[in-house]
Amino acid sequence: MKHYNIQNYIRYKTDLEKTIARIKIKEHYSLYERDTLVTLFMPLVENIARKFATSQQASGCMSILDLIQEGSLNLIKAVDRVDWDTIAKSEDQEKTMKSFLSKRIKGGIRRAIDTNRGQMRLPEHVTNSIRKNFGKDKKAVAMFFNSIFLSI
């Protein structure tokens, strides 16, 4: 893993600004710049994956390397889906880009954790509703699990 000190971070910021300046319009977006963006945002993937690995969400079901792999796959998908017009119009382009990519990376890692978590796989819409409510709607969760166990 790459460790960043202050000089490397300054170099990372200038490289990111140059890359975003080159890709103001979707027509100038090429495979080289796509690979450059993926490489530039890999430390973001590592950071997010480490946060998930140390939290209780991924304990026991996925290793840190699996989380980094899922995050990097979702980073590649997110870079392909970036709306460059929105990035060009925003005042702080780096912040806009990071927020978009981090949402996509976190969502992909959460989805991977949910699919690898237990013996019984829940449908994605059910896990999303449980995550949104975060256990507040215990009656709906209990009804769902009772319906599953009664059908067995």
Across the structure, where does each feature detected by a protein language model lie?
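Charged, low-cysteine interdomain linkers and short loop/connector segments
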Residues: 114, 121-152
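Alpha-helical promoter-recognition and RNA polymerase-docking modules of transcription initiation factors
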Residues: 1-121
